[in-house]
Amino acid sequence: MKQEFIDLAKYRLKKARNTLSDAKKYINNATLESTVNRIYYAMFYAVNALLITKGLSSSKHSGVRAFFNKEFVNKGLVEEKLGEFYSDMFKRRQKGDYQDFVKFERQDVTEWLKKGEEFINRIERLTLKIIEEQK
């Protein structure tokens, strides 16, 4: 893998971590809708980093999800439950960002934040493993 792609993947992992850090601050200091947004985007940046290891990218969220499922979930490299959680967080983010009168429960968002961190940890480990194997 070219160094520029390694650098980009690592940058996106860092962006995922920073966005996750924002979500942890938001849970107590912002709306729950904003927290859901940050959880999803942290996961999105991590998945984008992973896709780079396969030379893949998409300008659309649906394309990122499709590549992620096709190349990693369906091939058994990422657990199916993580693929489902990523899709669920996309739907929740859409709902929170674009629908009126949405109300998330703090207990649910707190659980999603925990699962989001576990998701990012898993995707980061896999991304770095693939990078190391391709050196």
Model-derived segments and spans:
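Terminal alpha-helical segments
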Residues: 1-135
